[in-house]
Amino acid sequence: MALIRVKNLLLRTFIGFNPEELANKQDVVINIEIEADIPEEALLADEPVGIYNYKTITKQVIELVQDNRFKLLEVLTKNILDLIMLDERVCHARVEVDKPHALRFAESVSFEMEAKR
């Protein structure tokens, strides 16, 4: 079992339902934790065949986030989690999405979800 983390992935998307949020992209910061089954042979071979490719899933997350609009932080988080869980090798995943400056006196607001098989 391996634990893969993608930390502080900074992306821009349409997130929210207020008029200003509907008109302008905003920053979101995404943290992903993936527990995946990686065969021992793949680790011993030191080759990319058979491993969980974090670059591939990161590109998919980027595409999902940047190419869509979301009213709710919760829906964005769930969509990312569902995308990650499509890979059968993933045993457990956790996704946290921060929306910086969502509240006047707070650095950010975040929503976190996890899924297990």
Functional labels for PLM-detected ranges:
Residues M1-R117:
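N-terminal, polar/charged subdomain of small-to-medium soluble alpha/beta proteins
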